[in-house]
């Protein structure tokens, strides 16, 4: 595999170049703005192209060395797209609401994930011994936990990289990433602060077509990383006397 290809035409057709109304801009975005049309800022796609390529490379490189990527997008038009892209590329996601401390208080989050796993087991076994009302309460609790944590249930620990749609809405997620030294790839619209982002992608963060394009490219970059990792493992495994045990086949550690 190789890094996913994209063209300037695809970016234009998806509306990536359309920023917000000029009065809503963040002056820090001035270097990324090409001009304005009908009081709407137009983003400079000649900068978006190389920056998006850099973002795709860091995603692929992170996954190739065994790292995890967390997709974050909780706004209505991003939610389903984020989950689909993460699932398709064997990564992780938060698409309902960012809970404060989701990264910085991972121990507490892990306890909630353990509770979610327990509920999965109970309900898969038809919740023997519970009344109809008790079962309904368990199902509601599970549904609530799954909505918040289902996308990170199997992540194991904090991610190695975060990909974010809408840096204003996901400001807490970015703050937590900064505190933990987790690099951030993010789409930055004309009303965003680019200073907080390690790998910025200047572009529209509201149009569903634009969001779908970013997520598809990031997912394909992650898949490229998986292919590279498997290729490297194939070389290493062939040279070893004993085959390594796949992590997925090992019994989960106590408290994991």
UniProtKB/Swiss-Prot annotation:
Coiled coil: none annotated. CDD domains: RPS2 (cd01425). One of its GO terms (cellular component) is cytosolic small ribosomal subunit. InterPro entries: Ribosomal_uS2 (IPR001865), Ribosomal_uS2_bac/mit/plastid (IPR005706), Ribosomal_uS2_CS (IPR018130), Ribosomal_uS2_flav_dom_sf (IPR023591). One of its GO terms (molecular function) is structural constituent of ribosome. GO terms for biological process: translation. Keywords: Ribonucleoprotein, Ribosomal protein. It comes from the Bacteria. The keyword GTP-binding does not apply. It holds the Pfam family Ribosomal_S2. Belongs to the universal ribosomal protein uS2 family. HAMAP family: Ribosomal_uS2_B. This is Small ribosomal subunit protein uS2. It comes from Brucella canis (strain ATCC 23365 / NCTC 10854 / RM-666).
